[in-house]
Amino acid sequence: MVIERTLSIIKPDAVAKNIIGEIYTRFENAGLRIVAARMLHLSKEQAQEFYTVHKDRPFYNDLVGFMTSGPVMVQVLEGENAIARNREIMGATNPKEAVPGTIRADFAENIDANAVHGSDGSGTAEQEINFFFKSEDICPRIG
């Protein structure tokens, strides 16, 4: 049993639809525990830094603009194989390709406003968690 942590962001489109609770229910029903959470409105600088890996991609400026268009809910999820499990319940990046019953298939509008972000690997998860949270902000709930 591998207990992992991963970063999840509920994006501005999903926050605006008032479906945070529905998404949290999906995390919990999948065996993931929320061990840290906060709502914030990303500044342009924060969004640029967080998504710097995409800075040379054609969608970068639109992504930064979207992520700063309204508040986001940022959380750390913990559980067995949390990274893969979260990515599975999120669904494909493009909601048109997402399996029915996944967060993106059920709630996302399009590939740009796709409801959620999740870390794609253990190194990325650690880096992304540290971007938003200090270690003392995380409350382990193993048990």
Curated annotation (Swiss-Prot):
- What catalytic activity is recorded? a 2'-deoxyribonucleoside 5'-diphosphate + ATP = a 2'-deoxyribonucleoside 5'-triphosphate + ADP; a ribonucleoside 5'-diphosphate + ATP = a ribonucleoside 5'-triphosphate + ADP
The protein's required cofactor(s) are namely: Mg(2+)
Pfam families this protein is in?
Answer: NDK
Where is it localised?
Cytoplasm
What the entry lists under InterPro entries is as follows: NDK-like_dom, NDK-like_dom_sf, Nucleoside_diP_kinase
Is ATP-binding given among the entry's keywords?
yes
UniProt GO MF annotations: ATP binding; metal ion binding; nucleoside diphosphate kinase activity
Active site as annotated: H117 (pros-phosphohistidine intermediate)
Q: Where is the signal peptide?
A: none
Function of the protein: Major role in the synthesis of nucleoside triphosphates other than ATP. The ATP gamma phosphate is transferred to the NDP beta phosphate via a ping-pong mechanism, using a phosphorylated active-site intermediate.
Q: Which family does it belong to?
A: Belongs to the NDK family.
Tell me, how does this one assemble? Homotetramer.
The name this protein goes by in its record: Nucleoside diphosphate kinase
Gene behind the chain:
ndk
